[in-house]
């Protein structure tokens, strides 16, 4: 990770606020930990890499798929992005809203819903960040990406390849791969 703004965000966002009390003493270890509903908070390296791959500029309109603990959401907001975030698990959605409010991080929109559908009513987006492993590239999300926009998405079943998809034209995309990772699965029609 070489982006100083990303490193600064990771250093300045208190990760322990986003974790279950049982794991707070380990909050600054570079590991993923369980949160509610069999989900996880990603390890700091993964959060930093995904954020760096987005190449965020102040004011970028970003769609985040999988609010989860809201740690990644906070990093994006800290970097002055306009964040629209969606979470399929209601308990996580409620908890993340509370934590974001407590820390005074306000996304443009925080929604309980199906991430596979995205938020077309608020698109198109400069960037899309998917924080769960997708078995395939969701076509609905590609449609919500601006021309010249980037989507960072882990693709695969048991393990995933971190992938950046750049929209070149209406139906033309470029893909770049950045190594293997393990994420909780991105599920369709499951809210």
Language model features with spans:
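Class I SAM-dependent transferase core
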Residues: 1-63, 67, 71-79, 92-106, ...
């Amino acid at each position: 990770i070489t982006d100083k703004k990303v490193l600064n965000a990771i250093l300045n966002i208190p990760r322990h606020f986003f974790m279950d009390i049982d794991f707070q003493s380990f909050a600054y270890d570079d590991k993923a930990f369980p949160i509610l509903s069999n989900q996880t908070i990603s390890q700091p390296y993964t959060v930093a890499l995904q954020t760096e791959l987005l190449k965020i500029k102040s004011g970028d309109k970003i769609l985040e798929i999988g609010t989860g603990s809201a740690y990644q959401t906070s990093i994006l907001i800290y970097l002055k992005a306009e964040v629209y975030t969606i979470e399929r698990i209601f308990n996580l959605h409620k908890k993340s809203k509370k934590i974001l409010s407590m820390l005074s991080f306000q996304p443009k929109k925080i929604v309980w819903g199906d991430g596979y559908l995205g938020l077309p009513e608020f698109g198109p987006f400069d960037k899309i960040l998917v924080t769960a492993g997708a078995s395939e590239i969701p076509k609905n999300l590609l449609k919500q990406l601006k021309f010249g926009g980037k989507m960072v998405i882990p693709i695969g079943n048991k393990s995933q390849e971190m992938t950046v998809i750049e929209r070149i034209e209406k139906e033309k995309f470029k893909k770049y791969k950045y190594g293997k990772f393990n994420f909780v699965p991105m599920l369709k029609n499951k809210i």
